[in-house]
């Protein structure tokens, strides 16, 4: 079995910054709280909560409140600053830029965002601009619009959405901006290319991770594909495949990917009788 590990794996810079900051605050002995997953990864969150991070939607006290990488609505941020002695905003810089862009364009035209309405990033965005968030093309009366995208969306799916919207409507002015994170785009392209040469693609990442789901869908077009959160989820028949490719979402730590590769090698060794 040949194991091919993608070059673009592990944390993106926004996730890495968020986790590093939370760990530093906890190491300082501060009571750190937040209202949801810092990142969409089960193992990472278990590690942080064991170190002392408190996660609850109804938190009202603590020394430090940390804003997740996905961001939160503007009004909520101001409210938290009145409640907590210290608020650390760990919103990904690329996500913050999306919020600012939506806010700016909302002054002159309708903002349409390609994304999942219930995703934390999109919930936060609506706190900055009165945007329509959807992945389904629709008819619209407004004549001046701007198209934006959730930062973890598929670029190709976003383009298809915009083209369909323009065909369905009679816009006088339509601005199209690529607000997708370049890190996720690079991973998307690598998965598109590598999965074509694989008999089996393994996508490692949290079940709630939007960008991991995107990579799974892309790989599934070209090869047998499985989505796992841990090495324990690897199926016994994985050893029957000649070429296995390993990909990861941006909230998946390198250590988890290394454990998956180690498990694959152990399974192959047992099949061959070498261990």
Swiss-Prot record:
Binding sites annotated in the UniProt record for dimethylallyl diphosphate: 40, 70, 119, 209-211, 251
Protein task: Catalyzes the conversion of 1-hydroxy-2-methyl-2-(E)-butenyl 4-diphosphate (HMBPP) into a mixture of isopentenyl diphosphate (IPP) and dimethylallyl diphosphate (DMAPP). Acts in the terminal step of the DOXP/MEP pathway for isoprenoid precursor biosynthesis.
Required cofactor(s): [4Fe-4S] cluster
EC numbers for this chain: 1.17.7.4
Originating species: Thermotoga petrophila (strain ATCC BAA-488 / DSM 13995 / JCM 10881 / RKU-1)
Pathway note: Isoprenoid biosynthesis; dimethylallyl diphosphate biosynthesis; dimethylallyl diphosphate from (2E)-4-hydroxy-3-methylbutenyl diphosphate: step 1/1; Isoprenoid biosynthesis; isopentenyl diphosphate biosynthesis via DXP pathway; isopentenyl diphosphate from 1-deoxy-D-xylulose 5-phosphate: step 6/6
Residues annotated as binding [4Fe-4S] cluster: 12, 92, 181
UniProt-annotated binding residues for (2E)-4-hydroxy-3-methylbut-2-enyl diphosphate: 40, 70, 119, 151, 209-211, 251
The keyword Metal-binding appears for this protein: yes
Binding locations of isopentenyl diphosphate: 40, 70, 119, 209-211, 251
Catalytic activity as recorded in UniProt: isopentenyl diphosphate + 2 oxidized [2Fe-2S]-[ferredoxin] + H2O = (2E)-4-hydroxy-3-methylbut-2-enyl diphosphate + 2 reduced [2Fe-2S]-[ferredoxin] + 2 H(+); dimethylallyl diphosphate + 2 oxidized [2Fe-2S]-[ferredoxin] + H2O = (2E)-4-hydroxy-3-methylbut-2-enyl diphosphate + 2 reduced [2Fe-2S]-[ferredoxin] + 2 H(+)
NCBIfam families noted in UniProt: ispH_lytB
Keyword terms of this UniProt record: 4Fe-4S, Iron, Iron-sulfur, Isoprene biosynthesis, Metal-binding, Oxidoreductase
UniProt-listed InterPro entries: LytB/IspH (IPR003451)
Pfam families xrefs: LYTB (PF02401)
Catalytic residues as annotated in Swiss-Prot or TrEMBL: 121 (proton donor)
Protein name: 4-hydroxy-3-methylbut-2-enyl diphosphate reductase
Origin superkingdom: Bacteria
Cofactor comment text: Binds 1 [4Fe-4S] cluster per subunit.
